[in-house]
Amino acid sequence: MSFDIAKYPTLALVDSTQELRLLPKESLPKLCDELRRYLLDSVSRSSGHFASGLGTVELTVALHYVYNTPFDQLIWDVGHQAYPHKILTGRRDKIGTIRQKGGLHPFPWRGESEYDVLSVGHSSTSISAGIGIAVAAEKEGKNRRTVCVIGDGAITAGMAFEAMNHAGDIRPDMLVVLNDNEMSISENVGALNNHLAQLLSGKLYSSLREGGKKVFSGVPPIKELLKRTEEHIKGMVVPGTLFEELGFNYIGPVDGHDVLGLITTLKNMRDLKGPQFLHIMTKKGRGYEPAEKDPITFHAVPKFDPSSGCLPKSSGGLPSYSKIFGDWLCETAAKDNKLMAITPAMREGSGMVEFSRKFPDRYFDVAIAEQHAVTFAAGLAIGGYKPIVAIYSTFLQRAYDQVLHDVAIQKLPVLFAIDRAGIVGADGQTHQGAFDLSYLRCIPEMVIMTPSDENECRQMLYTGYHYNDGPSAVRYPRGNAVGVELTPLEKLPIGKGIVKRRGEKLAILNFGTLMPEAAKVAESLNATLVDMRFVKPLDETLILEMAASHEALVTVEENAIMGGAGSGVNEVLMAHRKPVPVLNIGLPDFFIPQGTQEEMRAELGLDAAGMEAKIKAWLA
């Protein structure tokens, strides 16, 4: 994919931050306009995260203009907003390959560029890493500066506040920029407030402030009076008391779309000592009206026609597994007012929009707080309610201790609806749902189910919801279901699989939604095919029966082979001294990069052709 760079004459001059800093300051507003148009042109033709990057154009330009990157270290939280950063740091001509197999990584990635200081993808990690980087820079002694950019969603997570609390204690020289992209510019953002921000960040104010501290340090009453006076003056127009209490020097809020004003403020703050906090207000989707009006829809986009202002509509084919879950959730809630549903800021992705509208008093979006989500669910269960935690596989990792300590040990009936299990596609290493079976399987009192289709998914959700002896989990993938008929809901017998096809010599034990591919292989090789359904408890009787009646077994799962469902089958056979050969097919022992689900399954040998080739090579 190529772009006519001549349409962007100022941007054409910039393929590195060194070239950016050669531009006269007066040309930067024009650069921002071109950068925003280039981003629209590229993402609309390739797909990707969109609205966040439109909102950080001026901030990105200002940061790279003021700071000597990559010597000075710039850290982006999550990374959805970092497309302009990639464009300005030598990757302009490759931006059309982002999120594609072999293309640019969807997030800042250390292995891709020296400008990407921290590999990211999950939220709220930037300040913690930034403190460590700032401390290391201080010990290095080369006056290397550290800047972290974090959004108003990510900063709500406990990890961010833990980090800020630590920064206030050890006081490293660093800047945290809060990118506050609420739907409208705060009423505090205007000429007066921008002027105040520049004044408060200026050297004169800072010198007077520090000098006053020294002069009156021996006169506590006067020192305390001056401190209170400063707090009252700032408090009238500055909403930063919390950050000041955490030990930061707070500046803002300022207009995040005034690139020249940002440069002035950043230059003032660059040489200040201790932890600094700059609060900027931006508009998500800035410069593209449809994205400004609906930033959630335009957060991540497929290929689309910018002139239409609309994203392509779904073809109306098979429902996604997320929708299957959402429909089941609404159906069950209508019958049981004890049902409570919890999501850590994933309402749309988890299929909970309709539920949130129909049952607002039983819907809880706890924000980016996975640990709290799980323990909150534990509390609801203790109170006699039936909590369901809808969460992506990759984000459940962040609440592992809570699953163990707050739910499983207490045998609380919490249902985990684990979306995005297995290969997720374009978001790459940080988002693959590769490990949930491995990290949940070792937890006592846990029931773990792997549906092979949408009907089985519904039955398993129903089974888990009515299981009262401890926690349960149902894991299902990103993408569409397979089109089977939905039957009336009924509880499945816990820990029991079913034989789908009888064959000879070889038995394939399938866990989950790779079943259609496994069925093709079983037909081709005349193998027995088993839908195992439960990873925990395993159907040991069925496993031993298959071992006794077949020459070899193959396990299939879209999870890491190490510690996964296949490992559980191996353990059963070894415990019963059954030396039958077993081939475990699943995700290999490396982090799976980006690519479509189809591309990655084919590359990893998890489609029918790949599985059959692996089995034949193993049997040869």
From Swiss-Prot:
- Identify the pathway: Metabolic intermediate biosynthesis; 1-deoxy-D-xylulose 5-phosphate biosynthesis; 1-deoxy-D-xylulose 5-phosphate from D-glyceraldehyde 3-phosphate and pyruvate: step 1/1
- Signal peptide bounds: none
Q: In the UniProt record, which is one GO cellular component term?
A: cytosol
Needed co-factor(s): Mg(2+); thiamine diphosphate
The catalytic activity, as recorded, is: D-glyceraldehyde 3-phosphate + pyruvate + H(+) = 1-deoxy-D-xylulose 5-phosphate + CO2
Q: Where does this protein hold Mg(2+)?
A: 152, 181
- Which CDD domains does this one have? TPP_DXS, TPP_PYR_DXS_TK_like
* Biological process per Gene Ontology, one example term: isopentenyl diphosphate biosynthetic process, methylerythritol 4-phosphate pathway
Cofactor binding note of this UniProt entry: Binds 1 Mg(2+) ion per subunit. Binds 1 thiamine pyrophosphate per subunit.
Q: GO molecular function, one example? A: 1-deoxy-D-xylulose-5-phosphate synthase activity
Keywords for the protein's UniProt record, in alphabetical order: Isoprene biosynthesis, Magnesium, Metal-binding, Thiamine biosynthesis, Thiamine pyrophosphate, Transferase
EC number from the UniProt entry: 2.2.1.7
Q: Name one Pfam family in it.
A: Transket_pyr
Which PROSITE patterns would you find in this protein's record?
Answer: TRANSKETOLASE_1, TRANSKETOLASE_2
For binding thiamine diphosphate, which residues are annotated in this chain's numbering? 80, 121-123, 153-154, 181, 288, 370
**Superkingdom of origin organism:** Bacteria
SMART domains (UniProt xref): Transket_pyr
Regarding protein family, the annotation reads: Belongs to the transketolase family. DXPS subfamily.
Give the multimer and partner information.
Homodimer.
Question: Which purpose does this protein serve, as stated in its record?
Answer: Catalyzes the acyloin condensation reaction between C atoms 2 and 3 of pyruvate and glyceraldehyde 3-phosphate to yield 1-deoxy-D-xylulose-5-phosphate (DXP).
**Would you tell me the protein name for this molecule?**
1-deoxy-D-xylulose-5-phosphate synthase
Q: What is the lineage of its organism?
A: Bacteria, Pseudomonadati, Pseudomonadota, Gammaproteobacteria, Enterobacterales
* Gene that encodes the chain: dxs
